[in-house]
UniProtKB/Swiss-Prot annotation:
SUPFAM superfamilies on file: Glucocorticoid receptor-like (DNA-binding domain)
GO BP field: translation
Originating organism: Granulibacter bethesdensis (strain ATCC BAA-1260 / CGDNIH1)
Presence of keyword Transmembrane: no
Region annotation (Disordered) ranges: 1-20
NCBIfam families membership: PRK08881.1
Lineage: Bacteria, Pseudomonadati, Pseudomonadota, Alphaproteobacteria, Acetobacterales
Name this polypeptide is given: Small ribosomal subunit protein uS14
Any one annotated GO CC term: cytoplasm
Similarity comment text for this entry: Belongs to the universal ribosomal protein uS14 family.
Self-association and partners: Part of the 30S ribosomal subunit. Contacts proteins S3 and S10.
Bias (Basic and acidic residues): 11-20
Function noted in UniProt: Binds 16S rRNA, required for the assembly of 30S particles and may also be responsible for determining the conformation of the 16S rRNA at the A site.
PANTHER family: 30S RIBOSOMAL PROTEIN S14, SMALL RIBOSOMAL SUBUNIT PROTEIN US14M
Length: 101
């Protein structure tokens, strides 16, 4: 199991990222729009820099829903390889069968 503080920190980052998503997208659109004056674009850059860093989507780490493990995760299942193997072996994931040829 991962430290609960790390899992809670990541969940807080997810909430902040979803909250700030529209605001960040609007400011980024202003910054990238070449037709606007440089002053407006620079002001949007400063406002973007004032937003909290944890509100950025790339700060969110994909973690296992069961164990909180940060590595070897399958996005489709939101599980790490260890938890996926345990659940698949016990038949708790519908449609997932062990390969044999």
């Amino acid at each position: 199991m991962a430290k609960t503080s790390a899992v809670n920190r990541n969940k807080m980052r997810e909430r902040m990222a979803s909250r700030d998503k529209a605001k960040r997208a609007a400011l980024k659109a202003i910054v990238m729009d070449r037709s606007l004056p440089v002053e407006d674009r620079f002001e949007a850059t400063l406002r973007l820099a004032q937003l909290p860093r944890n509100g950025a989507a790339n700060r969110v780490r994909l973690r296992c829903e069961l164990t909180g493990r940060p590595r070897a995760n399958y996005r489709k299942f939101k599980l790490c390889r260890v938890a996926l193997r345990d659940l698949a072996s016990s038949g708790q994931i519908p449609g997932l069968v062990k390969a044999s040829w």
